[in-house]
Regions:
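Mature extracytoplasmic/periplasmic domains
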Residues: 260-263, 432-452, 624-629
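A structural "hinge/loop" feature
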Residues: 96, 112-134, 160, 188, ...
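Gram-negative bacterial Sec-dependent N-terminal signal peptides
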Residues: 2-29
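Surface-exposed binding/hinge segments that line
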Residues: 212-271, 427, 638
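Extracytoplasmic/periplasmic ligand-capture domains
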Residues: 30-59, 71, 75, 146, ...
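N-terminal lobe/hinge region of extracytoplasmic solute-binding protein
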Residues: 65, 71-75, 79-166, 199, ...
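Glycine-rich and polybasic anion-binding loops at the starts of cofactor/ligand-binding domains
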Residues: 618
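Charged, glycine/proline-rich intrinsically disordered loops and linkers
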Residues: 50, 257-279, 393-401
Length: 665
């Protein structure tokens, strides 16, 4: 089964983004084999552009605005648009808009499965995902649109920081902010917000910042140079990978004029708990730099976000962005997001649930379908992770012994050999959608090469031999292996999401595979798996784990801080030898400005990571972006996920809806 489109990948980097037919593959238990190449369902051709082709920063003599905000100006509720714009707004270039300058008005209909925890993203709160976070946050740099940039120019893009400069020794980075941008309440955005973000959030161990304390390197300090300039000082040379850490979400400052008075460092009556909850989901509107402001929240029903009248971005005809007036998020489930999009009652879906793929293929063939779907390359994957922390979250001697077992690479190899990826894939959806995954970078990553992925494929006999050699034998004859020397039965809990259907199906399929090698699995479904990984109270975990870009959230995938990755928390003094190698490679990526060196180090990381089975890769699949045909300026080649999720990759502020009115001057 294939998909035909008029687009074909053209660039060398994009030619690596392949992927989709599942193969039944065997492997010997002793030899090293590499992951076999897959076949792609995507036939897209993308003309990559230069980084300066997307946007610039430029002033206009006069600005246009939507009829909605103009009515507020006329009523005396807002200053004129010229007074709301920064000195030099971010300006989108028309040549990269597939449908050209947009039209004002209309409602973007979205469906998500998340729920807003609160709006203090500085303290790590989730706003519900699915686009809410991306629409209200703005970060210093930006990664999402990099999927369309030539590989030799694919460094992080400017955003709130319009430019920057490295010192000659690369031990300091000076960044210059856009001048005169305003928060949605009209307050000026400046380095006071940067100072609060860094010193009172990132550097405060009591705040669960999205950017870990040492993500830019231990000893990194911030120096404020003026209202719109600041400098990072590092203990050792750094490179452009640092800029990637300053993109969504870690590099998103919050409104200091709102949040600073709520922080314990500035308010003796405040606690860190009260600070974290200082922007509750029940109190709206909030203050943001994003294109849209949350104004209505009905629990488990909907979220409404309306255009930010102070948004600091424009198009080349000096029309203030965004184009459409509001987004309505229906709060149901992630699977319902795709169902609604296919039915025409939702406008957008990152189709990540392979169970819906067959229906999407049918819709593609129907000229009357309200939605168009474009399948990309294999960018989503599922892994089985083992808790590698020696003591974090351990509550018994049995659990401590299990952890030591998980830290043994031979045991991890045995588990990988036990996984029948073909059966797993077909249990999720029948068809040519799946391919084995070895862990690490997905096949669609520009940093992935199949020859770098060491693969311990399905071989139950080999798995049993390895376990026998580890002394894990059924010493009491009940059909379940025991820990060495007549120890307890080998019973292992497997954490997985109870709300994502693919995760549920994979966990169910894994049960018989564990039983076939004498291990008793106990499934542990949860609607809040983060709570378990945060406190370390888990053994194994099946989840989606897609690493696409080497420089993006590197601390989430490698142990560059003591609290990451999720499968090895509290790792100070606890790293395995191969993890120390991974850390050194990661430091190399963070220290270089040479993209070819980044690619070489990424290849090394993939080899080390997969040979040592850092996580057990299960399956990987393509994703499809579903867009209602009434939505304009959605680039047809935008991936569901690469440098960032599609909501950032397609630049939602440039989306417009086919019914509304043209901008008025």
């Amino acid at each position: 089964m294939g998909i035909e489109t008029k687009f074909k990948f053209k660039s060398k980097a994009a030619s690596l983004l392949v992927g989709v037919s599942m193969l039944a593959i065997s492997s010997t238990a002793s030899g090293l084999e590499t992951l076999p190449e897959d076949k792609s369902m995507s036939g897209m051709k993308i003309e990559l552009v230069g980084r300066d082709d997307l946007w610039t920063y430029k002033s206009c003599d006069n600005y246009n605005e939507s009829p909605l905000t103009k009515s507020y100006v006329d009523a005396g509720k807002l200053p004129p648009v010229n007074e709301r714009m920064p000195k030099e707004p971010w300006m989108a270039k028309t040549d990269q808009m597939v449908d050209g300058i947009g039209e004002y008005g209309g409602t973007f209909r979205h469906v998500i499965g998340g729920r807003p925890e609160g709006f203090n993203w500085l303290a790590g709160q989730s706003q519900g995902w699915g686009g809410i976070n991306i629409q209200l946050m703005e970060s210093l740099t930006r990664l999402g649109p990099l999927w369309q940039i030539k590989p030799d120019e694919a460094n992080p893009l400017p955003n709130l920081a319009k430019d920057w400069e490295w010192s000659s020794d690369r031990k300091s980075l000076t960044m210059n902010l856009i001048e005169g941008a305003r928060w949605s309440d009209g307050d000026i955005f400046d380095t006071e917000d940067i100072d609060f973000w860094w010193n009172d959030n990132v550097q405060d161990a009591n705040v669960a910042s999205r950017l870990p304390k040492d993500a830019l390197g231990a000893g990194t300090t911030l120096e404020i140079l003026g209202p719109y300039s600041f400098k990072f000082n590092f203990d050792e040379p750094k490179g452009n990978a640092v800029l990637a850490q300053l993109a969504y979400m870690g590099g998103a400052p919050g409104p200091s004029h709102v949040m600073k008075p709520l922080h314990p460092a500035h308010n003796s009556d405040a606690t860190y708990e009260s600070y974290a909850n200082g922007m509750p989901a029940s109190v709206l509107p909030i203050v943001t730099l994003g294109a849209y402001v949350p104004v209505v929240h009905k629990v488990d029903e909907l979220m409404v976000m309306k255009r930010n009248p102070y948004y600091w971005k424009v198009d080349e005809e000096c029309n203030q962005l965004p184009y459409y007036n509001e987004t309505i998020y229906k709060l149901t489930s992630w699977d319902d997001r795709t169902t609604q999009a296919l039915a025409g009652t939702g406008d957008f879906s990152n189709m990540e649930n392979p169970g819906n793929y067959v229906e999407a293929l049918k819709q593609n063939k129907d000229p009357n379908s309200p939605v168009k779907s474009v399948f990309g390359t294999r960018l989503i994957a599922w892994d089985l992770m083992m808790n590698l922390s020696s003591d974090f979250g351990v509550s018994s001697d049995y659990e401590r012994e299990l952890r030591q077992l998980f830290r043994n690479v031979e045991f991890r190899k045995a588990i990988s050999h036990a996984m029948d990826r073909d059966t797993m894939g077909q249990s999720v959806a029948r068809g040519p959608f799946f391919h084995p995954h070895a862990g690490g970078f997905v096949a669609g990553s520009p940093f992935h090469n199949f020859e770098d992925s060491i693969y311990y494929g399905y071989n139950a006999s080999g798995a049993n031999s390895i376990l026998d050699g580890l002394g894990l034998k059924d010493s009491d004859g009940n059909g379940i292996r025991n820990l060495p020397n007549g120890g307890a039965d080998l019973v292992i809990d497997i954490l997985h999401s109870s709300t994502r259907s693919t995760d549920i199906k994979l966990a169910d399929a894994a049960v018989s595979m564990f039983e076939a090698i004498g291990i008793k699995p106990v499934l542990k479904p949860s609607d809040n798996t983060d709570a378990f990984t945060d406190n370390g109270n888990w053994s194994m975990f099946i989840a989606r784990e897609h690493w696409v870009v080497a420089t993006k959230n590197i601390g989430d995938r490698l142990p560059t801080t003591t609290q990451n990755p999720a499968w090895h928390r509290d790792n100070g003094g606890d790293l395995l030898p191969f993890e120390e190698t991974l850390v050194e490679k990661a430091k190399g990526i963070l220290a270089t400005n040479d993209l070819s060196e980044v690619a070489s180090l990424a290849r090394d990381i993939q080899r080390v990571r997969t040979e040592n089975v850092y996580t057990v890769g299960l399956i990987q699949a393509p994703a499809a972006l579903l867009i209602n045909k009434r939505i304009k300026n959605n680039h047809p080649g935008a991936p569901v996920y690469m440098y960032e999720w599609a909501e950032d990759g397609v630049m939602l502020s440039l989306i417009h809806i086919s019914e509304p009115t043209r901008p008025s001057s």
